[in-house]
């Protein structure tokens, strides 16, 4: 895992619903915790692009549903600023299910993957067809 160069807006708090962008069998995920989050009292933990979160599978195959799994956020609707000054935003909030070490469980990723997530997680960048 590599550090992020951009200022990522943490726009996906606990309870946020994400699209599962891989072929593991999950369709919709709900954020239940953000790994390594140190926040203030009474503030909801939130994550952004490139962060590892723990999710609960809300929709998908019967084997996948109701499981708590680690995932990496690869897209977010809220725009964020890159180091060169450009602003980036995507059509949806999406994540891919991974192992605790960060290697994806699926064999393909649907849709674009943010450059920040691809740089930080080499396993995700290997499966990404489009890096934006």
UniProtKB/Swiss-Prot annotation:
Coiled-coil spans in chain: none
The keyword Heme is assigned to this record: no
An example Gene Ontology molecular-function term: large ribosomal subunit rRNA binding
Record key words, sorted: Ribonucleoprotein, Ribosomal protein, RNA-binding, rRNA-binding
InterPro entries named among the record's database cross-references: Ribosomal_uL14, Ribosomal_uL14_arc, Ribosomal_uL14_CS, Ribosomal_uL14_sf
Domain of life: Archaea
UniProt GO BP: translation
Gene Ontology CC terms, in alphabetical order: cytosolic large ribosomal subunit
Subunit structure: Part of the 50S ribosomal subunit. Forms a cluster with proteins L3 and L24e, part of which may contact the 16S rRNA in 2 intersubunit bridges.
Function: Binds to 23S rRNA. Forms part of two intersubunit bridges in the 70S ribosome.
Family to which the UniProt record says this protein belongs: Belongs to the universal ribosomal protein uL14 family.
Record's protein name: Large ribosomal subunit protein uL14
Gene giving rise to this polypeptide: rpl14
């Amino acid at each position: 895992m590599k550090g992020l160069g951009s200022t990522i807006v943490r726009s996906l708090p606990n309870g946020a619903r994400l699209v599962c962008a891989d072929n593991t069998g999950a369709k919709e995920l709900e954020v239940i915790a953000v790994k390594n989050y140190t926040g203030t009292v009474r503030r909801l933990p939130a994550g952004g692009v490139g962060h590892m979160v723990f999710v609960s599978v809300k929709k998908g195959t019967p084997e996948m549903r109701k499981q708590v799994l680690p995932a990496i956020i690869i897209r977010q609707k809220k725009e964020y600023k890159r180091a060169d000054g450009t602003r980036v935003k995507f059509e949806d909030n999406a994540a891919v299910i991974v192992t605790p070490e960060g290697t994806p469980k699926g064999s393909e990723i649907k849709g674009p993957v943010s450059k920040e997530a691809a740089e930080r997680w080499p396993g995700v960048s290997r499966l990404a067809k489009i890096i934006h």
